């Protein structure tokens, strides 16, 4: 007997792709939730989506200001780009619309993340080298 309460799992309709590499970037949990929601609502052909901070916030259970903070984090990490849109009302006035989000290829974000880590390690190595030279100079005096 077929159970009528369970639907078949169609991978095209009931799931969305989330790259495994996103977990290597050290994103905060809130930024990961916002990024996941944007991946969920994106148009798979243009990699773009429209959503207000309020819409995203209600989907991931955050306030609009918190969503704004995490969107800024995602932009800084190079995972998304945002573009302001405008709408024209029926009476001809121009108003701000919701943001247009473009999800960028994750490879660029990963490369940027590792370049930042390497730059930080280079700076630490340089500081260590300077510290050792300073100690050697102080011992020589």
Question: Model features per residue range: what roles?
Answer:
Residues 19, 39-44, 57, 74, ...:
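Generic alpha-helical secondary structure signal
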Residues 33, 100-102, 140:
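Generic structural signal for residues positioned in beta-strands
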Residues 27-32, 115, 132, 136:
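Generic signature of intrinsically disordered, low-complexity, basic-rich segments
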Residues 65-132:
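Winged-helix/helix-turn-helix nucleic-acid-interaction surface
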Residues 1-10, 22-24, 120, 126-141:
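N-terminal intrinsically disordered, low-complexity, charged/polar
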Residues 1-66, 94:
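Short recognition helix of helix-turn-helix/winged-helix DNA-binding domains
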Residues 6, 11, 40, 46, ...:
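Small/flexible residues
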